[in-house]
UniProtKB/Swiss-Prot annotation:
Protein name: 4-hydroxy-2-oxoglutarate aldolase, mitochondrial
Family affiliation: Belongs to the DapA family.
Regulation: Inhibited by divalent cations.
BP GO terms, sorted: 4-hydroxyproline catabolic process; glyoxylate catabolic process; oxalate metabolic process; pyruvate biosynthetic process
Amino acid sequence: MLGPQIWASMRQGLSRGLSRNVKGKKVDIAGIYPPVTTPFTATAEVDYGKLEENLNRLATFPFRGFVVQGSTGEFPFLTSLERLEVVSRVRQAIPKDKFLIAGSGCESTQATVEMTVSMAQVGADVAMVVTPCYYRGRMSSAALIHHYTKVADVSPIPVVLYSVPANTGLELPVDAVVTLSQHPNIIGLKDSGGDVTRIGLIVHKTSKQDFQVLAGSAGFLLASYAVGAVGGICGLANVLGAQVCQLERLCLTGQWEAAQELQHRLIEPNTAVTRRFGIPGLKKTMDWFGYYGGPCRAPLQELSPTEEEALRLDFSNNGWL
């Protein structure tokens, strides 16, 4: 049974054609997006009140939109109903002119199709689909092209590919990205791998398509802009939103020396809340910066005192605390 909040959002989505975007029409997704965390109570329930509080503060920054139910949102630990409810609540909380990109990836193609359609119905403007990875040994380019094509064929909203090899152990091959860029309902890629050469190559090889690449981390945002990326989905923007948006402005206006200086000061904090300490580190930092971070869902554990001190140093040594 779907909850009343979700049914209400579905009715609203159906009344507006499921999305502000028209299927098959390319949309401009350039800009900075924070991948929103999922707040939990002490009993591991989703805390929708704290979610709204965080969103209200994040909405004061010049983000292009918000990414919900990505890796930072702990989506593998949420039920399907919770994933939809979170997206529904975010849609209601954020300004109407902000894009809502929702993670809809599942392991099977059928489940991904169903989740993508449901995400559109509760208010998502764009679906972000992570690579299926449990059977990664059989996830060839052909298998992945088939998967994404089936999803994009049915999806009522545009699709963004999502490659995050640090979590999946699988990098979406360049040849697959190039092929998929030709699909009229696939508009871009979030690449979290950190290989700027790869990002530049993808931008180059998809230049004849209306295809956009978003950097998946603030740590290589400047370099990504330099090779043709149009924005970033950056976990660090949850705590240093103004600074990440400033880096975007510096890059877009060609102020490369100032951009380089700022980028240097973001690298260590970014690494700390991504690869080094992950979501527990990001949530702890959110608590320090006046947001609600709170606990993660098990099996993710809180930081040890030693880890917490190291995290604090990564921010204080760069002038952020």
